[in-house]
């Protein structure tokens, strides 16, 4: 024959009742219908309880928060949790037989007035809601309107200031660009003469020779002769003055620096008229023959 739901087969083939465990304990494995002969008692796992003797397993504890109720007693291994009344703004429906549901549901405007708990909670909510006096409401509205007006006015003034600022800078930039274009156009139409574009080297050389003129070496009797070239005629950018076709040759003393400046100066305009001039080197000095003409008596 077959064993019952609380029996197992022993080693002699007989049906034996499963072991019973006390409160807070359960069998380590299911026992019944001929199986579970080697099961033993063990403690209930967390969130489960067993309040009586038997071979049945531990049961799950109830969670009061899930059913919207206040928890009065916590769950233990030997007892279930105890839930109290419904949470605020919740109520339990009453069945036809007078029994109430375990779960609480929210209170709404459609809740029957017979539910005392909902009526009490709604009255508490209405009592807790503060009423604002009409004068204070008017004052709040006025202050809010003024704040909005001031904010809009500030934004408008800021926008106008930014617009004027950008326009001023744009006009100034356009005027500067126009003047630069006009100057470039004038320079392209009226180029600067090459004679005015002097280099720094030529300017320095001219300054040197203008401040330190060369004195020609002439005989005393020749320097006093009328019609002969004087010292002013030799104050040039080189050791020689401009040559003229009606002058005769006469030696003038020049240094090597004078010849170097004379050969490299671009502003000297009489370089091509030297023609038959000759340079003689005697010792540590150089002599240049410059033609000049002695006027006839």
Swiss-Prot record:
Recorded GO molecular functions are:
signaling receptor activity; transmembrane signaling receptor activity; tumor necrosis factor receptor activity
User: Extracellular side: which ranges?
Assistant: 1-138
**Single Gene Ontology BP annotation:** cytokine-mediated signaling pathway
Note the topology in the membrane.
Single-pass type III membrane protein
Where do the record's glycosylation annotations fall on this chain?
A: 74
Q: Which residues lie on this side of the membrane: Cytoplasmic?
A: 160-297
Signal peptide position in this chain?
Answer: none
Sequence segments annotated as region (Disordered) = 272-297
**Keywords from the UniProt entry:** Developmental protein, Differentiation, Disulfide bond, Glycoprotein, Membrane, Receptor, Repeat, Transmembrane, Transmembrane helix
Entry's transmembrane regions: 139-159
Show the Pfam families listed in the entry: TNFR_c6
Q: What role does this protein play?
A: Receptor for EDA isoform A2, but not for EDA isoform A1. Mediates the activation of the NF-kappa-B and JNK pathways. Activation seems to be mediated by binding to TRAF3 and TRAF6.
Please give the name of this protein: Tumor necrosis factor receptor superfamily member 27
Source organism of this protein record? Homo sapiens (Human)
Gene field:
EDA2R
């Amino acid at each position: 024959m077959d064993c019952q739901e609380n029996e197992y087969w022993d080693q002699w083939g007989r049906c034996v009742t499963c072991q019973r465990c006390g409160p807070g304990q359960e069998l380590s494995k299911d026992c019944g219908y001929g199986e579970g002969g080697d099961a033993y008692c063990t403690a209930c796992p967390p969130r489960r309880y067993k309040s009586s003797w038997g071979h049945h397993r531990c049961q799950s504890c109830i969670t009061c928060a899930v059913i919207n109720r206040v928890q009065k007693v916590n769950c233990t291994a030997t007892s279930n949790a105890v839930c109290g009344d419904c949470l605020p703004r919740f109520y339990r429906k009453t069945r036809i037989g007078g029994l109430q549901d375990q779960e609480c549901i929210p209170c709404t405007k459609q809740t029957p007035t017979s539910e005392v708990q909902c009526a009490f909670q709604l009255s508490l909510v209405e009592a807790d809601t503060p009423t604002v006096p009409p004068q204070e409401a008017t004052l709040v509205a006025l202050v809010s309107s003024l704040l909005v007006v001031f904010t809009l006015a500030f934004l408008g003034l800021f926008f106008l200031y930014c617009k004027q600022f950008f326009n001023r800078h744009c006009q100034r930039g356009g005027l500067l660009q126009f003047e630069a274009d006009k100057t470039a156009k004038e320079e392209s139409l009226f180029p600067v003469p090459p004679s005015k574009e002097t280099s720094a080297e030529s300017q320095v050389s001219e300054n040197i020779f203008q401040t330190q003129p060369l004195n020609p070496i002439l005989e005393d009797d020749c320097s006093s002769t009328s019609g002969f070239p004087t010292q002013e005629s030799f104050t040039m950018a080189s050791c020689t003055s401009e040559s003229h076709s009606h002058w005769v040759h006469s030696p003038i003393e020049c240094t090597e620096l004078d010849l170097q400046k004379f050969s490299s100066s671009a502003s000297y305009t009489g370089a091509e008229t030297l023609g038959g001039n000759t340079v003689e080197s005697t010792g540590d000095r150089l002599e240049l023959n410059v033609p000049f003409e002695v006027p006839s008596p």
